[in-house]
Design a protein with these regions (language model features):
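Nucleotidyl polymerases of mobile genetic elements and RNA viruses
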Residues: 1-222
């Protein structure tokens, strides 16, 4: 099934697919998602506050407000800062399956568990109903199903790839982030599922580093 995001029906990119999963698959998918919930707080970086138990998304919102307030009122020193807001368009539809598999391997999941998850997301197919009759058999090669209980969890795991790239750049002093005082930790980015807020020094070098990070993540994730 498809729904429209707006009243403008002329553009195809505004059409969202809604998958109709059978009951047995939804039970399996929900069970796997519940098993994930117990370990997500231990494997997902703390800058991701959405869809994680014992974390509130309002915490990241308050941190963003405080940092932007600091930037707007900063009048000491020569360094300026920049804030970039990223919105991943059709994020669920474009993720490469091999990428989620590699990320789960890096996070230490067993091969048996990874194979179970991959079977859930790869053994699917679609049909097109024309004049009331189902036609064709479309087999996707990327993306997560909209409405699948497992999809949000898998997307959080995929975003860890982006966080890992940013933290590696921060360790190499290529992407320094922002700190409001000497005793505070430096903040490089905050995540709200597929919406990201990045903080970095207003310099050509760090802007190039950010572009490099996003290009590498795009190439890997699709």
């Amino acid at each position: 099934m498809y729904i429209y995001e707006s009243l403008d029906f002329k553009t195809c990119h505004l059409i969202r697919p809604i998958n109709l999963c059978n009951v047995v698959y939804k039970l399996i998918s929900k069970t796997i998602a519940n098993r994930f919930k117990a370990i997500l707080p231990h494997i997902i970086f703390e800058n991701q506050s959405a869809l994680i138990s014992d974390r509130l998304i309002i915490d990241n919102v308050l941190v963003v407000f405080e940092l932007i307030h600091y930037i707007n009122h900063k009048n000491v020193g020569v360094d300026g800062y920049m804030v970039a807001k990223l919105d991943m368009s059709k994020a669920f539809d474009r993720v490469e399956w091999c990428f989620i598999k590699r990320v789960m391997e890096k996070l230490g999941f067993s091969s048996k568990w990874i194979n179970l998850v991959m079977r859930c997301i790869s053994l699917i197919s679609y049909s097109v109903i024309i004049n009331g009759a189902a036609c064709g058999n479309i087999i996707p090669t990327r993306g997560f199903q909209q409405g699948d209980p497992l999809s949000p969890t898998l997307f959080l795991i995929c975003i860890e790839g982006l966080s890992a790239l940013i933290y590696r750049a921060a360790r190499n002093q290529c992407f320094t982030g922002i700190s409001i005082c000497s005793d505070c930790p430096r903040v490089t980015h905050l995540l709200f599922t597929d919406d990201n807020i990045l903080f970095y020094k207003a310099s050509a070098g760090e802007s190039r580093e950010l572009r490099y990070i996003l290009q590498k993540y795009e190439e890997a994730s699709g």
